[in-house]
Amino acid sequence: LALVPSLSLAVLGLLSFGVFMGAIDVVVNIHAILVEQAAGKRMMSGMHAFWSVGGFAGAGLFSLWTATFGLTPLQSTCIAAGIIVTLILIIHRYLLPYGGGDGGALIAIPRGIVIVVGIVAFISFLSEGAIMDWSGIFLTEVHHFDLSLAGMGFSLFSGAMLIMRFFGDVTVHHLGQKLVVLGGSVLSVLGFLAIIFGEAAILLYAGFFIIGIGVANIIPVFFSLLGKQNVMPISLAVSAVGTFGYLGILAGPAVIGFLAHATNLYAAFAFLAALTALQGILAAFVYRKMGV
């Protein structure tokens, strides 16, 4: 991507990058489920926390290399690639040599309770995508914040998610996964209500932070839950739910944009609050159905 001379090649490169990243995302989650099962204790939230750390580190280091040290995008990319390859060479011997079941279907079509888990993932990722793209516009256009503060909403949301994922496994151990997921859904709804009805900056910031706390461990907990269902092989179940999640993060900004254009951003965020409430209802259904 740092070398492509045309837009068409850049699009092709990004498409290829997305395909391989999607495949890696599915595989590492399958690996995490198998490691968690073998260890006999909860580890998924912590693993997702390190995924968040990687995202922060990648964005932060790339900015540091280009802005502070004056490196070109190609030089920065080569350094990042070198770090990744080095880490892979160090840890590859510790990776499991087997997958999550015998499923080898070309397309992972969800069945049974996996469909409901997929919808929960869709809603969770949709909300994340919407906040990522629209929180800044909401703060600057609706509440007239300075442009320098446009990223505060998403930064607080992401920071809260990172913190809660590091403490997620301990929290789930003490409170139980059902309370964490259902309580997280309630917190997220309250966060959206604070954003919708709040006027003071502190209340708006608190709303984004609370949403981050609420949604942080929903996806890790449900990925762990996929290891306990027997409707589909783990590999296919994770792939199917991951597909729902990617659809959500793609649809989120577009859905909010459509609603904001048709009505306003208040109504769009109210729609997210309603979806989050539905997410909690679906989560309760999953737990009742699986007897967890």
Residue ranges and their predicted role:
Residues 1-5, 187-199:
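C-terminal ends and interior cores of transmembrane alpha-helices
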Residues 8-24, 203-216:
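Hydrophobic core of transmembrane alpha-helices in multi-pass small-molecule transporters
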Residues 15-16, 111-127, 209-213:
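Pair of pore-lining "gating" transmembrane helices in MFS-fold secondary transporters
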Residues 22-37, 217-230:
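Intracellular juxtamembrane helix-capping segments at the cytosolic ends
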Residues 66, 164-176, 260:
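Helix-to-loop junctions at the C-terminal end of transmembrane segments
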Residues 74-92, 269-285:
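Symmetry-related core transmembrane helices of the 12-TM Major Facilitator Superfamily/SLC fold
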Residues 133-149:
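Short amphipathic helix-loop junctions that connect adjacent transmembrane helices
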Residues 147-155, 235-239:
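Small-residue hotspots at the loop-to-helix junctions and early N-terminal turns
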